A protein has these predicted regions:
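HIT superfamily nucleotide-processing domains
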Residues: 1-149
Length: 149
């Protein structure tokens, strides 16, 4: 079970409140019913993240069955292609891609999707290792490990 502090948007986001909590198909997902994709293929829809941790944070959402590994593979492939194109065009220095699977891992929308986060050199200094997905987010102010209280 998640707390309000962990996912404050869940309790206040009308799109999430009005959506099916565990959709069985893409057409029942919160994204399909409340937003238009930035682009899409026959297997993947790409949306801007409603709560971005960095400018350009996108979600790559499988349109295939949520139990079909080909769908999530396609989402990762599309995110990777876009990231490499952004690097080639000089729009970003690097990027993170990843998933949260299950509430204990931070998932708040229960349909498979890949987070894509563009990164710039030095975009988050002073929080441990200078690279990696953890540095895309500001430190948790409630964490006992946070040295910036």
């Amino acid at each position: 079970m998640t707390s309000e502090r962990e996912f404050p948007w869940v309790d206040n986001d009308q799109d999430l409140i009005n959506s099916k909590p565990n959709p069985e198909k893409y057409e029942e997902s919160v994204w399909f019913n409340n937003d238009k994709p930035v682009r899409e293929t026959d297997k993947v829809a790409v949306y801007n993240d409603k709560y971005p941790c960095k400018q350009g944070h996108r979600l790559y959402i499988t349109k295939l069955s949520k139990d079909n590994p080909e769908g999530i593979g396609s989402a990762f492939q599309e995110a990777f292609k876009d990231g490499m194109e952004m690097i080639a065009q000089g729009k970003t220095d690097g990027f993170n891609m990843g998933m949260n699977i299950g509430a204990s891992a931070g998932q708040s929308v229960f349909w498979p999707h890949v987070h894509f986060i563009p990164r710039q050199t030095g975009d988050q200094k002073g929080y441990g290792h200078p690279r990696g997905v953890r540095q895309a987010f500001p430190p948790d102010p409630y964490s006992p490990n946070n040295k910036e209280k």
